[in-house]
Amino acid sequence: MDNSLHATTIYAVRHNGEAAMAGDGQVTLGQQVIMKQTARKVRRLYEGKVLAGFAGSVADAFTLFEKFETKLQQFSGNLERAAVELAQEWRGDKQLRQLEAMLIVMNKDAILIVSGTGEVIAPDDDLIAIGSGGNYALSAGRALKRHAAQLSASEMAYESLKVAADICVFTNDNIIVETL
């Protein structure tokens, strides 16, 4: 039996001057057991000016949150620089390479995915999703952005994650939304 804790959905969007990130609350042990339904996977960092969300191993994600916040402090809140430096360290360090998590980080100006393989990716359309329900949330978010532009970013984030929760067994509808 797979005893790793994983599976989630994180979605982030910038729309009409607002930035929002949403995450569900489910933590799954292996493929069969829901261990927790109210986990908080989206956090405010750097004096509340940056949002970060994770998908993957919980313990690994906390390590990455700490390292990313250190990089933000080191580079005076420069999101892109902190993300690139974290990705370089993550990829270059033998111990860190073992971490199994992905991050979405954002501020009012940018959204980035940071991965352990060294990628720092900015989406073309100001929305992105990761995790087991990521493709469902991303699809819903794109449809909302195109056809329901009157919604706020926080409403889009919530509704996109709600769609993912309706489809993905590893995503629940205990949704936390943070906005900037």
Curated annotation (Swiss-Prot):
Keywords: Allosteric enzyme, Cytoplasm, Hydrolase, Metal-binding, Protease, Sodium, Threonine protease. CDD domains: protease_HslV. It is an enzyme of class 3 (hydrolase). One of its GO terms (cellular component) is HslUV protease complex. Allosterically activated by HslU binding. Na(+) binds at residues 165, 168, 171. It is found in: Cytoplasm. InterPro entries: ATP-dep_Prtase_HsIV_su, Ntn_hydrolases_N, Proteasome_sua/b, Proteasome_suB-type. The keyword Calcium does not apply. GO terms for biological process: proteolysis involved in protein catabolic process. Its EC number is 3.4.25.2. PANTHER family: ATP-DEPENDENT PROTEASE SUBUNIT HSLV (PTHR32194:SF0), METALLOPROTEASE TLDD (PTHR32194). NCBIfam families: ATP_dep_HslV, PRK05456.1. A double ring-shaped homohexamer of HslV is capped on each side by a ring-shaped HslU homohexamer. The assembly of the HslU/HslV complex is dependent on binding of ATP. Protease subunit of a proteasome-like degradation complex believed to be a general protein degrading machinery. This is ATP-dependent protease subunit HslV. The gene is hslV.
